């Protein structure tokens, strides 16, 4: 048997053992990442009720300045547009929450899934 064939056969025999010993190390999870905590706090601050009130006040004040502000210079007008858009973006999550949308819902839950069994209520009760 040549040296090359011997090396290939040893490698083929050893590879399942090596892969089996590495699998637990690859499957372990390190927990959460260090930046997830602060990002979750920012997200909770932006989507809370206080942020909704701040967004409403920002939209009202910026809109009032743009409508009744008279002669604003270009910088002040652009600043009011930025405040107006920021208020709308902060308030958008609150507005979506008012309509009952809390997150993605893919598929039906078990209690809402249609059943193939006849129902004992309503028109399904034949007897």
Curated annotation (Swiss-Prot):
Membrane topology type? Multi-pass membrane protein
Localization recorded for this chain is: Cell membrane
Q: Does the keyword Transmembrane apply?
A: yes
Task: Give the superkingdom in one word.
Answer: Bacteria
> Where is it chiefly localized?
membrane
Is Membrane tagged as a keyword? yes
* InterPro entries xrefs: TrbC/VirB2 (IPR007039)
What does UniProt give as GO cellular component?
A: plasma membrane
Task: Give the transmembrane region(s).
Answer: 7-27, 50-70, 79-99
Q: Which family does it belong to?
A: Belongs to the TrbC family.
Protein known as: Probable conjugal transfer protein TrbC
